[in-house]
């Protein structure tokens, strides 16, 4: 059978023959373009794997010079280190982990391309500041060998210039502008350092506030002095719950003044969020932190604030996600970023316990927070003997937070079997706070648990209701706390749980976990 081509086949063949053939040059150009495209994709993949777009993570050793330089006390060296951290975070956008000594084991940092270990060696020369330091990149650390430090010997300069020079000569490029965080007048700067050192030890807070307040008058354009004064005032008011409401608006105004001068300053936003959370307004606290995080997406402190506010609102998945993101940026194994109470509420006891390790020189150690929560954890586990030891230790610290000292003493008396004496002290403390709209609903639930341990169910129920009214809305802990077990058969308890669930549901709708990924 003979196949005869159809007309349309012939026309297609004729058309294809009439088309011009691509030239050799065009083929070569096409091949070159394809190679460039494939190469570009490969390079982008390789850079992504190496983390070129990753944030710089800085491990900052803050107090190395204190032991060898008599011109700086340990607290002053740490205060200068904290100010260096603020400069690196605010101007560089870096994720900074602050430690007090070079880690004995550097394996965690070894091979990390975008990790910088930096040891400060500040010195005071008259009114000038010398910000010398040494650094080594994580990728340069070799197993079994001492770090190959690069030394930066600084010149003694007026303090503000010293900070600007540090940023200008930093191993990673930082956009340098005149600092808004360090006072330009040397005398004001050294007053600020002394006030910050007292804050770190929880000592002489009224004197520290007087120094900081004088600094705001002398240098009203310096954001750092306003933020420090707000920080000091916040700490002072927490020690005096009766004055919290009266002082809250003034403290907020101080921090907001700092934020106007230094928009998006992480520490100021964090402190302002604590004020909002402690007064039961976690919604505003979370809005503030999420907004600040748009400017500072790699800041661990902002994520700590989100975890704190979310925990108080009962948003445990959001709090846990914030903690995970924070620990990806900071080196939590070198220095816990916070007492991770969230993990106690979720049942992750080992992680909570890991956040309670001592940090010599840190406020969490000197304030009594760490031994108090070690005692609290032991109590949750049913180890009353260990709990008794830890509460006694917390109650005897010379510079502990007053609220921690008093509550530790009450728990100590309960576990010693002196319940009547404990009840009297607890009632006295309770009466001091009634009608004062005391801050911190989470602390109030600890008072409810103390009443329950003593056996006063009516007072415990009243205090648990007050904790809810003060903003502590973590339904899961109300339901899981072993100390609150005696209340769970009371009619008022079921009504309280219903109110908790309703409020928590509204907050869950407003702040889904995915917000952190979008933010």
Segments from the language model and where they lie:
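N-terminal intrinsically disordered, acidic low-complexity segments at the extreme N-terminus
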Residues: 1-19
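Hydrophobic membrane-insertion alpha-helices, especially the h-region
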Residues: 29-42
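A structural "domain/chain start" motif
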Residues: 40-79
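Catalytic-center loop of serine/cysteine hydrolases
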Residues: 81, 87, 102-198, 203-207
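Alpha-helical tetratricopeptide repeat
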Residues: 184-200, 223, 227, 266, ...
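Short coil/turn linking the two alpha-helices of tandem helical-hairpin repeats
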Residues: 195-203, 230, 235-242, 279-280, ...
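Alpha-helical protein-protein interaction modules
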Residues: 206, 281, 286, 290-293, ...
């Amino acid at each position: 059978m003979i196949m005869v081509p159809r007309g349309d086949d012939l026309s297609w063949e004729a058309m294809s023959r009439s088309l011009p053939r691509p030239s050799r040059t065009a083929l070569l150009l096409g091949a070159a373009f394809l190679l460039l495209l494939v190469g570009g994709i490969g390079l982008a993949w390789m850079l992504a794997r190496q983390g070129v777009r990753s944030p710089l993570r800085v491990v900052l050793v803050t107090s190395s010079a204190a032991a060898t330089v008599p011109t700086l006390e340990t607290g002053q060296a740490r205060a200068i280190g904290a100010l260096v951290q603020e400069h690196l975070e605010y101007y560089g956008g870096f994720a900074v982990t602050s430690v007090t000594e070079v880690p004995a084991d550097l394996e965690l940092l070894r091979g990390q391309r975008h990790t910088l270990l930096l040891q400060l060696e500040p010195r005071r020369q008259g009114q000038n500041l010398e910000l010398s330091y040494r650094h080594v990149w994580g990728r340069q650390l070799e197993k079994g060998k001492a770090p190959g430090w690069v030394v930066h010997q600084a010149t003694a300069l007026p303090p503000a210039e010293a900070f600007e020079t540090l940023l200008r000569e930093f191993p990673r490029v930082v956009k340098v502008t005149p600092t808004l965080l360090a006072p330009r007048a040397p005398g004001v700067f050294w007053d600020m350092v002394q006030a910050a050192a007292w804050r770190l030890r929880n000592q002489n807070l009224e004197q520290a506030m007087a120094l900081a307040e004088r600094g705001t008058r002398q240098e009203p354009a310096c954001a750092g002095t306003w933020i420090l004064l707000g920080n000091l005032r916040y700490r002072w008011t927490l020690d005096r719950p009766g004055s919290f409401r009266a002082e809250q608006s003034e403290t907020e105004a101080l921090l907001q003044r700092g934020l106007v001068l230094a928009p998006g300053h992480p520490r100021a936003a964090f402190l302002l969020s604590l004020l909002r959370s402690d007064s039961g307004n976690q919604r505003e606290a979370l809005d503030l932190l999420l907004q600040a995080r748009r400017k500072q997406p790699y800041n661990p402190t902002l994520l700590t604030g989100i975890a704190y506010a979310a925990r108080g609102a009962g948003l445990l998945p959001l709090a846990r996600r914030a903690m995970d993101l924070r620990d990806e940026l900071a080196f939590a194994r070198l220095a816990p970023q916070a007492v991770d109470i969230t993990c106690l509420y979720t049942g992750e006891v080992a992680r909570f316990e890991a956040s309670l390790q001592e940090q010599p020189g840190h406020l969490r150690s000197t304030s009594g927070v760490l031994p108090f929560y070690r005692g609290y954890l032991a109590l949750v586990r049913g180890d009353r003997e260990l709990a008794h030891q830890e509460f006694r230790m917390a109650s005897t610290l010379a510079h502990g937070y007053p609220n921690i000292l008093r509550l530790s003493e009450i728990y100590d008396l309960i576990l010693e079997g002196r319940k009547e004496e404990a009840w009297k002290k607890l009632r006295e403390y309770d009466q001091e706070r009634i009608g004062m709209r005391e801050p911190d609903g989470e602390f109030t639930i600890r008072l409810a648990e103390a009443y329950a341990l003593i056996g006063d169910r009516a007072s415990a129920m009243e205090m648990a209701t007050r904790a809810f009214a003060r903003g502590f809305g973590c339904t899961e802990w109300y339901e899981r706390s072993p100390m609150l077990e005696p209340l769970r058969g009371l009619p008022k308890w079921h009504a309280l749980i219903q109110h908790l669930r309703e409020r928590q549901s509204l907050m869950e709708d407003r702040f889904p976990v995915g917000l952190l990924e979008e933010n």
